[in-house]
A protein has these predicted regions:
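Short glycine-enriched loops at secondary-structure junctions
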Residues: 83-88, 187, 203-205, 260-263, ...
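Metal-dependent amide/peptide-bond hydrolase catalytic core
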Residues: 2-6, 230-454
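Histidine/acidic-residue-rich, glycine-tolerant segments that coordinate divalent metal ions
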Residues: 93-105, 109-110, 122-256, 263-268, ...
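Divalent metal-coordination and catalytic microenvironments
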Residues: 29, 68, 81, 108, ...
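Short connector loops/turns at beta-strand edges and beta->alpha or beta->beta junctions
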Residues: 84-93, 142-144, 211-216, 274, ...
Length: 454
């Protein structure tokens, strides 16, 4: 049997020989961004690549997910390499879709290229026979929680149950045959000076859709007869801001509402105003506590103006916890490629990912390869080191898989034996479903009081 080091050299050399193909995959996806649950072209590209590698992909999972499998030479743990199919909406990005405003301003195109690059390296270098266990290549939809109204409509039609890709895939049973998962995100030099890094944890989040309802009236002649739903929303937002000093620093609470509809016409008192917000925090307890305060503020805005408020609470992301032992194995491979000091383990990050949901069920890691410049989710975000951004994730995924599954897969088995899931799948789904809630609070009078004449 070949040694781990020999296999790693072989897979990295194979990835380098196919560098142009892997980079072109990443750049092609970059030029054709698609939002969550709409990633039809991207999914088709992934499926075609998997078929060419003999991975017999399953398609249409949670609408657009694609899943292929490389069987090892012996039974063993089942390791998933995950890549996220979706883009954001960043209409000012130079490569944004001119119709939809979609843009890969978070680097998910590099995730898919890296996942497929690892598949190319492992299959063409003939690595599988040296491994005990399977490698699952899983392109998943809808990591970015955007287009809430569109996704709510999909839920109402029964097309999906959850509005994020990984929770939906868990509910449909598509992670039942996976024991541990990893993916590699693109990071920018603003986040770390090393070539790659791993945060210990990140925030979870609840999602809120809010509707304030008032009464329309002529905004110039008779505003007294209207009930201004926009004013109710603004009072609620100011009340949320006033809560910030009540949050504990250790809970890393982040609340960032936007107005998605502010009224119908400038000459009409706004009768319907809609908002969306995340309620983020470092623990479930912190999120639940902050959410109660947000709900009070929303009700207060409606009460102050005499309006109505409709509050939809939606499960979002669970807090992320990276597996320490998996992270150590990954980090050792980073330093093999780039030298000592080029892998950094950081603290807590205040963004969110639905890898946090998987982390409650199985060992996962969600590291970053630093290959971009600009602001994540911004118009200036771009991968400025294409070879590093697309090829390094492919190599690191493959190298880590060899470490985990080589021989009798002892490292993977040890990690699984030591892992205590925070929830069973059944408890996870029960908890997620319990978070869906719609409440309506009416403070509006039947008819606005008219002034006496004479």
């Amino acid at each position: 049997m070949s040694s781990k080091d020999q296999l790693k050299r072989a897979v990295c050399e194979t990835i380098d020989r196919h560098a142009d193909t892997i980079i072109d995959l990443g750049e092609t996806i970059l030029r054709h961004p698609e939002t969550g649950f709409n990633e039809v072209k991207t999914a088709a590209l992934v499926a075609d690549q998997m078929r060419a590698l003999g991975l017999a992909p399953r398609t249409g999972l949670a609408l657009t997910g694609v899943k292929g499998r490389l069987a090892g030479g012996a039974p063993g743990p089942r390791l998933a390499f995950i890549g996220e199919l979706d883009s954001l909406r960043t209409s000012e990005h130079p490569l944004a879709d001119p119709v939809t405003g979609a843009a890969h301003s978070c680097g998910h195109n590099a995730q898919i290229a890296g996942m497929l690059g690892a598949a190319i390296g492992l299959t063409k270098a003939g690595i599988a026979g040296h491994l005990a266990g399977d490698i699952v290549f899983f392109a998943v939809p809808a990591e970015e929680f955007i287009d809430v109204e569109e996704r709510a409509a999909r839920v109402a039609k029964g097309e999906i149950e959850f509005m994020l890709g990984k929770p939906e895939l868990v509910a449909k049973g598509h992670f039942d045959d996976i024991d541990m998962s990893m993916m590699i995100h693109t990071g920018s030099r603003d986040a770390a000076e090393a070539r790659a890094f791993l945060a210990k944890s990140s925030n979870g989040a609840l999602v809120k859709r809010i509707r304030f309802l008032g009464r329309a009236a002529h905004a110039g002649s008779l505003p007294q007869l209207g009930v201004n739903a926009l004013n109710a929303a603004m009072i609620a937002m100011n009340a949320i801001s006033a809560q910030r000093e009540t949050f504990w620093e250790k809970d890393t609470i982040r609340i960032h509402p936007i107005i998605t509809k502010g009224g119908d016409a400038v000459s009409v008192v706004p009768a319907e105003v809609t908002m969306e917000t995340f309620v983020r925090g470092g623990s479930l307890e912190a999120i639940v506590d902050a959410n109660k305060k947000v709900d009070r503020c929303l009700r207060a805005g409606a009460m102050a103006i005499g309006a109505e408020v409709e509050i939809h609470t939606i499960p979002g992301y669970l807090p992320q916890r990276n597996d320490e032992r998996l992270g150590q194995i990954f980090g050792a491979n980073v330093e093999t490629l780039f030298g000592p000091g080029q892998f950094h383990i950081g603290g807590h990050r205040t963004g969110s990912t639905d890898m946090g949901d998987l982390a409650h069920l199985m060992p996962v890691i969600h590291p970053y390869v630093v290959a971009a410049e600009g602001k994540a989710h911004g118009a200036d975000w771009r991968i400025n080191e294409p070879r590093h951004g697309y090829l390094t994730p492919a190599k690191l995924l493959a190298m880590t898989a060899i470490d985990l599954l080589h021989g009798d897969a002892a490292p993977a088995k040890e990690i699984l034996a030591q892992f205590n899931p925070a929830m069973t799948k059944e408890a996870y789904l029960e908890f997620q479903r319990s978070l869906f809630r719609t409440e309506r609070f009416a403070y509006i009078e039947e008819e606005a009081r008219r002034p006496k004449i004479g």
